Amino acid sequence: MERSFDALFSQASLFFLAAVRVFALMFTVPLLSVRSVSRVVRVALAGLIAFLVLPLAYPAPMQVREFSAYYVLLLLGEGLLGILTGFFISVIFTTFSAAGQFFSYQMGFGTSEMYDTFAQIENPLMGQFLNFVAMLVFLQIKGFQILFLGGVLRSFQAVNCFVFLRKQEALLLFFTKALSALFLHAMTIALPIMGALLLIHVSMGLLTKAAPQMNLLSEGLPLTIVVTFVLLSVILPYMINLFVSILFGGFEMFEQLLVKLGKAL
């Protein structure tokens, strides 16, 4: 243990580089970026992860002069890498919030919003519900272990901050594909409920046109709400597998980006 701490003090500059990237990731990744998680916990966790990945992230000793302009640029680049990684993880979870937004208005919850503590924005109620389910799935599949123990280490081994200056087109294409996949997955989640609600609205419109005295429009809002919750209770157990595939698909997409950027080193 003493040797480990001696090695840490001898490579303090590299340790701070690793800690800055992990610390920036902590402040942007869902679940850990919320205000309920204290900064002390995030700093301690970032330091622990940086200490664990340091021998594997920098197997060969590097001589970097502290407090030089080059070292400051390295710190800024590592912070940018952590922020972009956390932003991509946030994009994955935005898929589930967007899916809830697609059918919230149709079911009558268009104006019912609540504060999303994860994204720190106002989010429709159903989007918040699906996002919460996705968080539980993320914890169930050991997403934190995959992200912080595997993903962080692979990012250190594959990418440094100067790669972004040489691979801007690859990054732009990657985030474009990620946003396209976000919309596609959100539509896949919301489409069954949107289709059922569309049939209900069309049926009520035809019945109201055929028999105006029935006044079905006054009963339409409770009916759509009840049908939506019944459909969610039926299809949600089957959608868990889709949630898992979306999360793992996002991790695989990010790993492919690291491999592609690693070739530029």
Swiss-Prot record:
The keyword Metal-binding does not apply. This is Flagellar biosynthetic protein FliR. Role in flagellar biosynthesis. One of its GO terms (cellular component) is plasma membrane. Belongs to the FliR/MopE/SpaR family. It is found in: Cell membrane; Bacterial flagellum basal body. The gene is fliR. It comes from the Bacteria. It is a multi-pass membrane protein. It comes from Treponema pallidum (strain Nichols). The keyword Nucleotide-binding does not apply. The chain crosses the membrane at residues 14-34, 44-64, 73-93, 132-152, 182-202, 229-249. GO terms for biological process: bacterial-type flagellum assembly; protein targeting. Keywords: Bacterial flagellum, Cell membrane, Membrane, Transmembrane, Transmembrane helix. It holds the Pfam family Bac_export_1.
